Amino acid sequence: MEKRVICCIGDSLTEGDYGVYGVTGVANVHEKNYPYFLAKELKCETRNYGRCGLRADQYLDYYMENNLDMSDADIVMIMLGTNGGHSVTEDTVPNESYKKLIKVIQKDAPKAKVILVTPPHVTANPEFANHWYRTHVEVSVEFVRNVAEQEDVYLIDAAKYEEFNEETVKIYQKNDGLHYVEEGYQEMARFFSRKIKEFFPEMFG
């Protein structure tokens, strides 16, 4: 039986940035990211199409310019919003780009199931360098939930995952309070794999 293919769209939390202690805006990308661990959890092939620092509008440009191969994808996961730009009260360019990205992917990967993922926990603790991301991540979470309902696509609400919280930030997000480290990405993949098995038992029975 051929391995299932999961394409992972996103920003630094997909690409696998661990962050740097006490510093903001410096990439520290590692191989052991959530797609790496998800492949092991589900015994599938994952393709990591994450790009650090991108909002939805910037990611749409990147997607269109790079001809990312989606043709044989069984599942496409989209986890964007950490870098802001979204609003639930007015139309913004990132809002429109996020919705357009879904449509483009549905066209490019006709057999794929699309899963939207809310950005996961960001600390509010000012001791961590990237705590300030929390404000726009909260808006993005609400935006993604709304889009999943409007577009009738699957949603993994990572923001509600109870294992990621203000207590465990010192374990899973210990460098900057935003990016995860190896243990965090592994736990994220475990959570995602459980949800994917619930959604698609016929694929991962």
Report each predicted region and the residues it spans.
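Conserved beta-strand segments of the P-loop GTPase G domain that flank and frequently precede/overlap
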Residues: 78-79, 115-118
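Catalytic His-Asp segment of secreted/periplasmic serine-dependent ester chemistry enzymes
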Residues: 7, 120-205
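Short hydrophobic segments within beta-strands
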Residues: 9-10, 117
